[in-house]
Design a protein with these regions (language model features):
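Active-site nucleotide/adenylate-binding loops and adjacent lid/helix of ATP-dependent enzymes
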Residues: 1-51, 55, 96-99, 193
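Protein kinase-like catalytic core scaffold
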Residues: 9, 46, 68-69, 114, ...
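Short, low-complexity Ser/Thr-rich regulatory SLiMs
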Residues: 51, 62-64, 118-122
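Peripheral (often C-terminal) accessory segments that flank ATP-dependent C-N-forming ligase machineries
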Residues: 55, 159-193
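A short beta-strand motif that forms the metal-chelation/ATP-contact edge
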Residues: 60-62, 125-139
């Protein structure tokens, strides 16, 4: 806990998603009880510094060296800003500095396609809080921007037939997401929103 700046701190179960398994540790007693229980359950937990952000964060979809679309998420019930936890979202434009932060965060873990979550503290400093190789599709419905069109264009312009890469494959992530309504249509017929 001291390594992340003390309490309050955020705990995240490593196998959680959409805000499930994210909790705040506010007191030494609460932290000790929660972490001891999770340890006994063999649960893997990541601790992060708690950053006052007004229960808002930003999800940016990175495709190659660009941010395809970004959405601000605002929490309604607690500190979590996840849409699936009752939050709301709206399309936003990022500053050049925040675009660079998001692209570099994806590159740091060798991803050409990622959802990068950032938030700003009360002074406006940007923090990367998560990089996700399978970012989901709610952002398409909320922003009206289908980032899969950008992703396919990126793949078409950057992959040579027969070329091999040392990067981990994201094909399984893309196929799961694409398995919804667009799978049987050519990519150029997907909704462009």
């Amino acid at each position: 806990i001291n390594k992340v700046g003390g309490l309050p701190a955020i705990g995240k179960l490593l196998n959680g998603s959409q805000g499930v398994g994210v909790f705040i540790l506010e007191t030494p007693q609460a932290a000790n009880t929660a972490l001891e229980s999770l340890y006994r359950l063999n649960a893997n937990v990541k601790l992060q510094k708690f950053i006052k952000s007004g229960a808002k964060d930003i999800r940016a979809i990175v495709v190659g060296d660009k941010v395809s679309v970004a959405m601000e998420r605002a929490g309604k019930k607690d500190f979590r800003a996840n849409i699936s936890q009752g939050g709301s979202g709206r399309k936003v434009e990022l500053s050049d500095a925040d675009i660079e932060i998001c692209v570099n965060a994806a590159k740091a873990i060798n991803l050409d396609f990622a959802g990068v979550d950032i938030l700003k503290d009360e002074e406006g400093k940007t923090y990367v809080i998560e990089v996700n190789g399978n970012p989901g599709t709610k952002i398409i419905d909320i922003t009206g921007h289908n980032y899969f069109v950008d992703l396919v264009k990126y793949v078409e312009s950057n992959v040579t037939k027969g070329e091999k890469s040392d990067k981990p494959s994201q094909a399984s992530s893309a196929s799961v997401i694409l398995g919804k309504s667009w799978l049987n249509a050519p990519w150029n017929q997907w909704p462009k929103h």
